[in-house]
Amino acid sequence: MAGSKSPKGEFAGRKLLLKRKASRWHHYKYVNKALSLKLKADPLEGAPMGRGIVIEKVGLEAKQPNSAIRKCVRVQLIKNGRQVTAFAPGNHAINFIDEHDEVVIEGIGGPSGQAKGDIPGVRYKVVLVGKNSIRELVRGRQEKVKR
């Protein structure tokens, strides 16, 4: 701030403060934080988990250098009707999830709430199918309730 355009002198404190306040709005991270844009864009609206209905099962190709089809599901959230893609973690976990099932999703745990690993654009993972934990279903400790 000690450039040629900055006010100098004994009583320049207030002017420097106002100039710094105005300059902060040129930084995108400050703008996002001040206007809470991350919360507005979040499909879960700041909640740690969300319930939704499975619309379809999808297989996503892993990013290079890996070669795999990651099993995911498209979920429509009950609270606001938004659609998100959620990863089905575990071996053959996709077999326990059917269309029109109610699932609970949570963040996948990527950096800054973004995608994790080689799954492109997937920020969420399935935690519960109906009332059963997906981990317990995969391990065979629980059975999915037939309606």
Swiss-Prot record:
Does the keyword rRNA-binding feature in the UniProt annotation? yes
Answer whether the UniProt record assigns the keyword RNA-binding to this protein.
yes
GO cellular component assignments: small ribosomal subunit
* MF GO annotations: rRNA binding; structural constituent of ribosome
**Which one Pfam family would you cite for this protein?**
Ribosom_S12_S23
Which keywords describe this protein according to UniProt? Ribonucleoprotein, Ribosomal protein, RNA-binding, rRNA-binding
**Which biological processes are named by the entry's GO terms?**
translation
- Check the UniProt entry and state the signal peptide residues, or none: none
Family indicated by similarity: Belongs to the universal ribosomal protein uS12 family.
Q: What does this protein do?
A: With S4 and S5 plays an important role in translational accuracy. Located at the interface of the 30S and 50S subunits.
Give the record's subunit note. Answer: Part of the 30S ribosomal subunit.
HAMAP family listed in its UniProt record: Ribosomal_uS12_A
Record-given protein name: Small ribosomal subunit protein uS12
Species annotation: Methanococcus maripaludis (strain DSM 14266 / JCM 13030 / NBRC 101832 / S2 / LL)
